[in-house]
């Protein structure tokens, strides 16, 4: 709101000039001009908030796509690892496949907190949030990003049709959700309240 300060100061100075000399036409013209300038400043600032929101939505969509890709690859690797361990009768581990899977888990963990449970057959189960199953053996759930039913400008994270946004924690995806909910939304609301207060 630092860029709003000069416009607001100029507007209030012009208001004081009119209050001091209500009959002055030049003072009234200056006040109207400053009011228009202030309105433009509000619109510019609101436009910046919308640009940031659009970018956050794009970023979240990209992260959801990445998570889906990692989950599918992990499920496919689970199948190969179980088959290889079965063929080797447990005497030799498919280290290259295990390394690939670990690498995918590390990438996934940068985006969202994950819990991993190793199964006896060599496969792993991957859980996110408050215990939602993202990968179970050869099955990978699908994450999606959809408009909130309460606010179409808000994107929410769904897993197999269920909204899990408020159950996630950690990582870049959760960070984007928190930034939107705890920084962007309140700032834009404050701007709106300020504009409304000036109008009324």
State where each predicted segment sits.
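Structural signature of extracellular appendage/secretion-system components
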Residues: 1-200
């Amino acid at each position: 709101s630092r860029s709003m300060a000069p416009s607001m100061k100029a507007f209030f100075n012009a208001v004081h000039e009119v209050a001091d000399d209500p009959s002055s036409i030049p003072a009234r013209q200056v006040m109207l001009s400053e009011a228009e300038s202030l309105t433009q400043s509000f619109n510019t600032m609101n436009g910046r908030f919308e640009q940031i929101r659009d970018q956050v939505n794009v970023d979240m969509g990209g992260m959801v796509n990445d998570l889906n890709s990692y989950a599918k690859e992990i499920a496919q690797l689970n199948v190969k690892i179980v088959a290889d361990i079965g063929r080797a009768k447990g005497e030799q581990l498919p280290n290259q496949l295990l390394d690939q899977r670990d690498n995918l888990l590390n990438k996934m963990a940068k985006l969202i907190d994950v819990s991993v449970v190793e199964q006896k057959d060599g496969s792993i189960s991957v859980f996110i949030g408050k215990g939602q199953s993202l990968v179970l053996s050869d099955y990978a759930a699908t994450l999606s990003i959809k408009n909130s039913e309460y606010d179409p400008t808000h994107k929410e994270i769904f897993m197999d049709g269920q909204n899990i946004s408020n159950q996630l924690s950690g990582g870049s995806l959760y960070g984007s959700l928190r930034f939107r909910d705890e920084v962007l939304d309140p700032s834009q609301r404050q701007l709106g309240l300020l504009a409304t207060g000036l109008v009324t």
